[in-house]
Amino acid sequence: MKKRILSILLLCCMVLTLLPTTVLAADGPMDTIPKYDVSIDVYNRTSDISIKDSRSYYIYSSVPDKLRDTWAWDKKIFIKGDKAAPHVFIDGVNIKMSPSSKGPAIELNKKASAYLYFIGKDSTLQGADGRAAIQKNRSEGQLYVLARTGTTVTCKGGYRAAGIGGSWAIRNIGDSMFNMDMYGHGVNMHFGSQSNPDYWGGTINATGGEYGAGIGAGSWGHSGHSGNTIHGGAGERLYFYSGTVNASGGRLAAGIGGGFRGRGSHIYIYGGNIDAQGGDTGAGIGGGSWTTKQDMDGINAASDIVISGGRVSARGQYNCAGIGGGQYVPARNITITGGHVSATGHYGAAIGGGRWCHGKNITITDATLNLSSLYHFTNSNASAIGFGDLVYDTEELVTDPSIATNDQIRIGSYKGKLVQLKLEARALSRDDEYSYFWNLYETLIPDENGLIDMQLLTLPYVQNYGWAINVLEMTVIDDPCNGNHDFGWVNRQSCHVWACRNKDCQARDPAAEMSKQNGKHVPGDWGVRERRCAVCDHLLEKDTAAPVLEVLNDGESYTVEDVIVGRPGAYSFTVSDPAKSGEASSGVKSVTINGVE
């Protein structure tokens, strides 16, 4: 009996080894392309592809090459159920849903997860009206989208839907667009690979339909009950690791983040080349557009945006920040710890709040920045980092910074680097005149925590400039002094500034106690030949010209006074002209002072 049981167990083990291996969701995305469990050709297929398991699928199109640019499949890939987490490899598939079909090109439904890999030939996906191209409407489950290096996938959302993410958040059962899973969320979505970024370095293009984000939330919609409106879903918990991502929001929506009247938050960029452009009144990365001012501490503020690597370019549209708030949307908790970041605001901050709104708790370290509030084109009062237009009158602000709130805007380096700035700002001159300054260069030393409070950035000849920077370039550089700075007074723009005197460094610590004495030179008393600053001992004036008296007569006495050096003493002397009587004098030959010739 025992031998029979052992034989049965051995047979079961042999059978199990012959079964295809299924990759489970817990394993995460694959590093390379595997052997597939299922292959499906969509060319001439007349029904949706429905997936309810976690196997690996290869979905391709055998359409002839001469038809590939014009032929499109009009069915969807439907991934359904909380047990589903398939790995779907898509090769050269073009899906274009009819506007009235109510279908995304690829749909995750009923809490499903999915790993989508675009390989081989390029693919294009178009959602129906109200539907995203790749739609994930719930916060449950996760979506990974990866493109093989050399492959491009282009996703376009339908009217009121995201390119990748949420549908139109319509909950009115009487609306023809309605179905039960239309929450408008674009949540818990991942792009690229952390473990094999070079392999998965392809291009993902995502464009939202009107009111929908490129990647993130769809538009708000009605519930169908009088006065009861459901706002747009959330564009949050969005993660970017590798490859190129080009995200463009539809009108009133962010490139990455919130749709119209939808929030954009918890966005994390670890690598890749990310280009995000908002639609009209949408941020590049962050919040969508609102019609009333949102609360800084409320759920609709653009918040918790983290960039630690890669190259990021973000452009906000009218009334919006590049990274942060859309129209009427404040921003908080933005952290950048590396990478190259370019951001442009349009009446919003480059990084921070949209128009009428603050940006708060923004920390940028060990990164390269190129930021602009488009002041030259708009005359906006928005800052490069912090507040949007119409929050402050900048002339009043730089004249009296006490009117401002402490928004905790900080730059620096956690790696012992110096921070180098090139900027344009509005500030007060050394004569207290309000003016615009450009091509201002600074090299700064972070404090013991590696940070620099931008509100402390002031110089006696560009007073309080840290409050109203409009254009900012920032890099971090090695410290030539290795932290052992030769601090002292240096002369800059006819002012004394406490800084490192090493000519290869010249950095300053804006938080140093001695920096409080930075200012215009204070003339001290005259010495015998020199006059110096009473604070820093910088030479201000030097007396090098001897006093001159003209038309001196023989035998008369004169007194000479050196007025320039403050009359240190007066000397009487007698002039002697040795010319004989009747002869013309050839000039004074000697002067006798106090009996000494």
Task: Map each language-model feature to its residues.
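Solvent-exposed, low-complexity, repeat-rich "mucin-like" stalks and linkers
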Residues: 549-577
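C-terminal segment of classical bacterial N-terminal signal peptides
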Residues: 15-24
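Thrombospondin type-1
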Residues: 480-548
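Positively charged n-region of N-terminal signal peptides that target proteins for export
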Residues: 1-10
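Append "Rare intracellular matches occur via the same short Y/T/C beta-strand/loop motifs
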Residues: 57-59, 452-466, 496-503, 527-542, ...
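A composition-driven surface/loop motif
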Residues: 26-480
